[in-house]
């Protein structure tokens, strides 16, 4: 998989991230902000420079290349225009390449044999979460925190990677966790995948929401995210279904 430039360089995000997905998203957002500040700053500097340099002064004649009615004279510097165009194209190409790399990172779950797979079913108006042991929760998603001691050689443990198989039981919905920077459409008859790794044990009330207008109860289509320690999640999981 292509690793984004900002990930290779460890570009920090503007705010602390709660998961690798959020960290990658924040890093790309920071990259866009830096590019926007540089380009915008350069434009404003040139704007005020030319405004001061070429302002009309009393007693000075109009320049020969000033615009006039009729045939335009040759103006400007084609070489400079070509250089600026090449720089802008390179900038936009780099941003686009990193955006596609981030999409690939978010849309393709890692090959983790110890990942937890959860079926997510949207309905009017709520979320149902079905675990591999057939246990179901409505309005609450429980996941294990990142467990660095869980390796592929260790069976019966969860690494912390959570893969969500998202669908809908009725109309179109859109499953999203803003804190983790993940969002996928929930479409009847189709399964879309999302994944994340939570790095901090905590309770995030109403962190899960529907991001597509789906009826009169759309605003109430929320769910809590509970990130449990490895032991607590294991104990809870074994009590199901």
Regions found by a protein language model. Name each.
Residues 2-29, 51-241:
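Non-transmembrane, membrane-proximal soluble domains of secreted or membrane proteins
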Residues 25, 29-42:
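Alpha-helical transmembrane segments
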Residues 38-46, 87-94:
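Residue-level signal for the membrane-embedded core of alpha-helical transmembrane segments
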């Amino acid at each position: 998989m292509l690793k984004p430039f900002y990930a290779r360089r460890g570009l920090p995000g503007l705010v602390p991230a709660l998961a690798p997905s959020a960290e990658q998203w924040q890093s790309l957002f920071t990259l866009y902000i830096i590019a926007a500040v540089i380009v915008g700053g350069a434009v404003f500097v040139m704007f005020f420079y030319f405004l001061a340099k070429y302002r009309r002064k009393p007693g000075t004649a109009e320049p020969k290349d000033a615009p006039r009615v009729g045939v335009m004279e040759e103006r400007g510097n084609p070489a400079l225009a070509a250089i600026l165009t090449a720089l802008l194209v390179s900038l936009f190409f780099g941003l686009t390449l990193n955006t596609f790399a981030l999409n690939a990172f978010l849309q393709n779950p890692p090959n983790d044999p110890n990942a937890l797979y959860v079926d997510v079913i949207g309905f009017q108006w709520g979320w149902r979460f079905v675990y591999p042991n057939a246990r179901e929760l409505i309005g609450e998603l429980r996941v294990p925190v990142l467990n660095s001691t869980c390796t592929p050689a260790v069976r019966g443990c969860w690494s912390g990677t959570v893969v969500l198989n998202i669908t809908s039981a009725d109309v179109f919905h859109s499953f999203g966790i803003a804190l983790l920077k993940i969002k996928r459409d929930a479409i009847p008859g189709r399964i879309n995948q999302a994944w994340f790794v939570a790095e901090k044990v905590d309770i995030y009330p109403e962190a899960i929401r529907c991001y597509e207008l789906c009826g009169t109860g759309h605003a109430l289509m929320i769910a809590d995210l509970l990130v449990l320690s490895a032991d607590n999640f294991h104990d809870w999981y074994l009590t199901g279904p």
